[in-house]
């Protein structure tokens, strides 16, 4: 079995006809329906899911074979997993999925291991890699060709040029943060 | 003329000096700033600022469509990464 990703989790029930509320981890919550069928964490149970609506940031869906509230309640807390290859495969040049970047080993240009990618975030000024440094500390690097010259998803690594901060005479006055 | 127009955009005084210095150096350095309240001006386009969020400096590469916004808008103080598994990151 290849790598899998969790696209959602069942967090509650909706109504008395077996509908469930799902916290979706896809970029557009309702897109979780496109990944049906899904399986639980153990891979033993398959779920065919049909999205029927959205409420308060959660997706409402019906599951094939689940027709009453009690059966739906028993699924509360179940994660919904799909194989990695089911995620969008066609990416433009220099485009990467967040889930592929997270966990990559971070190396300096000279090959020295610096740490791993903890998270990727976009605060409105482009994507930023949050890197957990080894043995401790963290570093934020803009996801640009200058700062991240090499991304090797297959090799599980990326190369980073750590940011150089301009000297600041006011730093001590501001608490040296 | 409206008061907000003749007063001009707010900017902490030292920001322009820092930006000029960084641009003159020619190196691609990150400029550490604590002034989240300052407005992003056209002369900052192309520079990278490390905007303090109370904990760390978030790198902000200034582009044209960020002019007029405040630096603090791009450096959230409460971080929630989310879980978007199929979200795409574009390397610029």
UniProtKB/Swiss-Prot annotation, chain B:
Gene Ontology molecular function terms on file: rRNA binding; structural constituent of ribosome
GO biological process: ribosomal small subunit assembly; translation
Pfam family membership, one: Ribosomal_S19
Any one annotated GO CC term: cytoplasm
This protein's record includes keyword Zinc-finger: no
Source taxon at top rank: Bacteria
Keyword hit for Nuclease: no
Alphabetized UniProt keyword annotations: Ribonucleoprotein, Ribosomal protein, RNA-binding, rRNA-binding
Family note: Belongs to the universal ribosomal protein uS19 family.
Role of this protein: Protein S19 forms a complex with S13 that binds strongly to the 16S ribosomal RNA.
Protein name (Swiss-Prot/TrEMBL): Small ribosomal subunit protein uS19
Native species: Paramagnetospirillum magneticum (strain ATCC 700264 / AMB-1)
Lineage: Bacteria, Pseudomonadati, Pseudomonadota, Alphaproteobacteria, Rhodospirillales
């Amino acid at each position: 079995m290849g790598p899998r990703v969790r696209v959602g989790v069942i967090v509650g029930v909706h109504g008395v006809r077996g509908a469930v509320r799902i916290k979706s981890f896809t970029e557009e919550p309702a897109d979780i329906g496109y990944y049906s069928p899904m399986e639980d964490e153990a891979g033993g149970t398959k779920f065919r899911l049909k999205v029927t609506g959205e409420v308060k940031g959660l997706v409402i869906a019906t599951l094939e074979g689940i027709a009453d509230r009690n059966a739906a309640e028993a699924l509360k807390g179940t994660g919904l997993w799909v194989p990695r290859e089911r995620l969008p495969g066609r990416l433009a040049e220099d485009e990467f999925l967040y889930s592929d970047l997270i966990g990559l080993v971070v190396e300096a240009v000279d090959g020295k291991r610096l740490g791993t990618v903890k998270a990727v975030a976009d605060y409105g000024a482009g994507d930023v890699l949050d890197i957990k440094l080894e043995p401790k500390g963290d570093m934020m690097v803009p996801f640009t060709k200058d700062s991240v010259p090499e991304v090797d998803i297959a090799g599980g690594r990326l190369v980073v040029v750590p940011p150089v901060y301009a000297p600041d005479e006011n730093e001590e006055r501001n608490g040296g943060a | 003329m409206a008061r907000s127009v003749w007063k001009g955009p707010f900017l902490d005084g030292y920001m322009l000096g820092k930006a000029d210095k960084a641009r003159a150096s020619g190196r691609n350095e990150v400029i550490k700033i604590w002034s989240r309240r300052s407005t992003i001006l056209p002369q900052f386009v192309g520079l990278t600022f490390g905007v303090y969020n109370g904990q760390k400096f978030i790198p902000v590469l200034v582009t044209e469509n960020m002019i007029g916004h405040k630096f603090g808008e791009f450096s959230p103080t409460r971080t929630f990464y989310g879980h978007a598994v199929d979200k795409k990151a574009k390397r610029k």
